[in-house]
Amino acid sequence: MSVTTQDNGKPFPAEPLLTIKPMDIKNDIYIMKMNDKLYQRLIQSEHIIHAKVESVLGQISSWKYATHELYVPAPYQNELAGLPSGRIRKNVEEKDRLKIAGLYSFGFDAEGKILCSQEAPENIENGIITDIYEYDDAFSYHVFHVRYIPNQYTIIISISYFYSYHEMSIFQGINAYKDWSVYLYEYDKGRISKVHSYASCWGDREAEEYNFVYDNNILCAIVGEKRLKNGELDIHWKNKKVYNKES
């Protein structure tokens, strides 16, 4: 079966080699040091985050809308997290985007790069859950996940970072309580072949591994490395349009 990826517009390194020795993402020193750096950046950003959010909102050139998360730069985050992908909502006016509870708004710059996402709250006085994207280069970026109260203040909930590391890429984040999580992507010929994930709240549990199964140039399933107790495949996610249980 061929291994490729769907045309989802998400950035992958060009033709990397397969990693020779998988990282122990629970205990890897580099990942631990990155957690420390991210936490320090979270703390240092607390006094400037409100101005940063309002500055980014002022840079938005266009908005798109959906019923759930849809424009997520990190590869397959919805699928890996078991979350539904949003459906595009049309005929939404910008002035009404925060009045429709549960509506997701995605803000883009003039070049079409996503700068932020917001979920319209039930009560705007309780704040708007907002993601602010800050790019280091064409591939790596930080995400500030915040609660934004317009014209008042902003609270940082967590900070995440997507970056390349040797032949792999990593998406990891940490919150104000130092709880952290990490996704490590392995590639084959420039395309995702496997993802390892771990969250600190899992304690002694082993990191999870997921294999990406493709057919006819389309991702058809994300399958757990280990089988279920009954011997069945652990199908974490499947593309209902193309998935064939017998393949």
Name each model feature, range by range.
Residues 2-247:
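Buried hydrophobic residues that stabilize the cores of well-folded domains
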